[in-house]
């Protein structure tokens, strides 16, 4: 069922039906919160509906939660901190 929801949500997105894509992918994430692929495809839909900040925040969180790359993990704390602060300017 996870794959079916991902496929349907992705298809809606590629057809420009972002409302149904959002609905299907959010349902998938609710039912299968550990499925990172659903979350990544959801970030694509967020991007398409101009929710760039939400898309980037979720994508960064998925990245640091799933990577084994030591160079990224060295900066995990900073990536998590800045994930929802991309528009902030520090003075």
Model-derived regions, located:
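Alpha-helical adaptor scaffolds
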Residues: 1-30
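Register position in tetratricopeptide repeats
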Residues: 14, 48, 82-85
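Alpha-helical repeat scaffolds
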Residues: 20-28, 56-62, 90-91
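A contiguous pocket-lining binding segment that forms or flanks enzyme active sites
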Residues: 22-24, 34-48, 62
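Solenoid-like repeat scaffolds
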Residues: 26-34, 64-69
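TPR/TPR-like (Sel1-like) alpha-helical repeat modules
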Residues: 46-70, 80
